[in-house]
């Protein structure tokens, strides 16, 4: 675990954490594994760490949330899943869907689509999930910067007790949603 040091946004993750994470994955991933990938700057920095994977692994990297948008595409789950797959010389399955829906009815209809059901069915088979913990503070919030949410929503989450998020799922000090 690394707390965010007071350096620039692009330097917030140490090179050692990135290479250590990749070395760990290199050691534990095996053929047939399903690897879920979320979003964000930490995962971006990990996948771009200076580390060469020893052997190709026939696993599949799957975004665990959608990610279509106009800003910071390199931090979206689809792009990160693809980059992890490239790094490990593996496969990835894209999930071209919004990360958030403004209308619950649209979301319910979307979940009925065969291609979406296929991706959702893989979530139950995940062996590993790569995620980072976001903070609901404007200066550090990647999801705010990506325009998934606005400052008012972020402030509302904080006022309701949110201390962090994992894959856009906010939680309080006790880990409860």
Where are the regions a protein language model picked out?
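Conserved phosphate- and dinucleotide-binding cores of soluble alpha/beta proteins
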Residues: 67-177
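N-terminal active-site beta-alpha-beta segment that forms phosphate/nucleotide-binding
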Residues: 1-102
